[in-house]
Amino acid sequence: MLDPIAIQLGPLAIRWYALCIVTGLILAVYLTMKEAPRKKIIPDDILDFILVAFPLAILGARLYYVIFRFDYYSQNLGEIFAIWNGGLAIYGGLITGALVLYIFADRKLINTWDFLDIAAPSVMIAQSLGRWGNFFNQEAYGATVDNLDYLPGFIRDQMYIEGSYRQPTFLYESLWNLLGFALILIFRRKWKSLRRGHITAFYLIWYGFGRMVIEGMRTDSLMFFSLRVSQWLSVVLIGLGIMIVIYQNRKKAPYYITEEEK
């Protein structure tokens, strides 16, 4: 088992979980700022947004997790804020981040669809890296399997939990998001019929479908009346993505690739 603590500075312990999240954030900010001028968005506005959105998204991710595990946390109030042990629900962070983005874009007079389109691939790569935090914490894993011989030794050893090998669902989602990120990079440079909002829709459909399938493999899903919450939200995301495509096509939204770029 790998040590979840990356750096120990006296009483201060810096965990791999936190490093994975921060690394994903830094890369996401860099990529978003790089694409921002293409949509006539000031890069400094991206930094301003992150300073507001990131802490609120972390809070939203934790609140979401605590709400659906309230039976446990109501008896362990001191652990509610112990986010270094894991327990950040991605969907809670996404919902909070989307609300903050809408308000921020409105106040800065930025087109919301443009902002979402340049942020979507960055969010996907951040999620891909962030999932490795689950790896170090030995969480977000799946059912038992006989062996994991097809995986590198360090992953196989870390997925040996409670006397059994476990499906590395964190890895499946990380790779799924990485592939989605790569496809978006190709689409937004090559797909000339791509309209404003289509990248956001692709993210919602791609991530929603992948999460719905992978969530079914997990053994630690957040439940609500015997239903997997994330799977229901995944269906909502897929439906929302499809509606965005239909809506933007019908209103003949501007193309993502401008005439000057074609």
Swiss-Prot record:
Enzyme Commission (EC) number: 2.5.1.145
Top enzyme category: transferase
Transmembrane segments: 9-29, 41-61, 80-100, 109-129, 167-187, 197-217, 227-247
Keywords of the record: Cell membrane, Membrane, Transferase, Transmembrane, Transmembrane helix
Residues engaged in binding a 1,2-diacyl-sn-glycero-3-phospho-(1'-sn-glycerol): R131
GO molecular function: phosphatidylglycerol-prolipoprotein diacylglyceryl transferase activity
Keyword Ribonucleoprotein included in the entry's annotation: no
Functional pathway: Protein modification; lipoprotein biosynthesis (diacylglyceryl transfer)
Recorded topology in the membrane: Multi-pass membrane protein
GO cellular component terms, A-Z: plasma membrane
Compartments where located: Cell membrane
Xref: NCBIfam families: lgt
Similarity comment: Belongs to the Lgt family.
Protein name: Phosphatidylglycerol--prolipoprotein diacylglyceryl transferase
Name of the gene encoding the protein in the UniProt record: lgt
